[in-house]
Amino acid sequence: MNPQREAAPKSYAIRDSRQMVWVLSGNSLIAAPLSRSIKPVTLHLIACRDTEFSDKEKGNMVYLGIKGKDLCLFCAEIQGKPTLQLKLQGSQDNIGKDTCWKLVGIHTCINLDVRESCFMGTLDQWGIGVGRKKWKSSFQHHHLRKKDKDFSSMRTNIGMPGRM
């Protein structure tokens, strides 16, 4: 394995079969129809190399950052369910360090519930089906440490414009 190659972010643009893309509206991530006037976000994916967060069953944790922004995706437990959120995370200069530095990471594995008020579309290339509640095969939250659970001032919903 090449550690420098592992530390380099892999970039992904998210688009579904209906040509909906993720865009930032303030500090909210929403889905909008792809057009020339829309600038979709690009996600940076980096594997966490901190052994504290290793899990042989679930695989390596990953960091999902929004390219060019100080925002990252993470999972928070809301009403007993893992929920995808955005978090202000400081400088992206820390990406690729040997520690996850208090980030709540995401394992790339099974079912993540999303808030019922959010309609997520059909992000087919990630195996996500049409639905309001479940991502068919995407992310599962990492165990939340007590000190990481309170992000209420940084929390935001993910969904369609006008559906919040």
UniProtKB/Swiss-Prot annotation:
The keyword Secreted applies. Expression at low levels in tonsil, bone marrow, heart, placenta, lung, testis and colon but not in any hematopoietic cell lines. Not detected in adipose tissue. Expressed at higher levels in psoriatic plaques than in symptomless psoriatic skin or healthy control skin. Increased levels are not detected in inflamed joint tissue. Induction: By pro-inflammatory cytokines IL1A, IL1B and TNF in synovial fibroblasts. By IL1A and TNF in keratinocytes. Constitutive in articular chondrocytes. GO terms for cellular component: cytoplasm; extracellular region; extracellular space. The keyword Secreted applies. N-terminal truncation leads to a dramatic enhancement of its activity (>1000-fold). CDD domains: beta-trefoil_IL36. SUPFAM superfamilies: Cytokine (SSF50353). It is found in: Cytoplasm; Secreted. GO terms for biological process: cellular response to lipopolysaccharide; cytokine-mediated signaling pathway; immune response; inflammatory response; innate immune response; positive regulation of T cell differentiation. Keywords: Cytokine, Cytoplasm, Immunity, Inflammatory response, Innate immunity, Secreted. Its main location: cytoplasm. Residues 1-4 form a propeptide. One of its GO terms (molecular function) is interleukin-1 receptor binding. Cytokine that binds to and signals through the IL1RL2/IL-36R receptor which in turn activates NF-kappa-B and MAPK signaling pathways in target cells linked to a pro-inflammatory response. Part of the IL-36 signaling system that is thought to be present in epithelial barriers and to take part in local inflammatory response; similar to the IL-1 system with which it shares the coreceptor IL1RAP. Stimulates production of interleukin-6 and interleukin-8 in synovial fibrobasts, articular chondrocytes and mature adipocytes. Belongs to the IL-1 family. PANTHER family: INTERLEUKIN-1 FAMILY MEMBER, INTERLEUKIN-36 BETA. Interacts with cargo receptor TMED10; the interaction mediates the translocation from the cytoplasm into the ERGIC (endoplasmic reticulum-Golgi intermediate compartment) and thereby secretion. This is Interleukin-36 beta. It comes from Homo sapiens. The gene is IL36B.
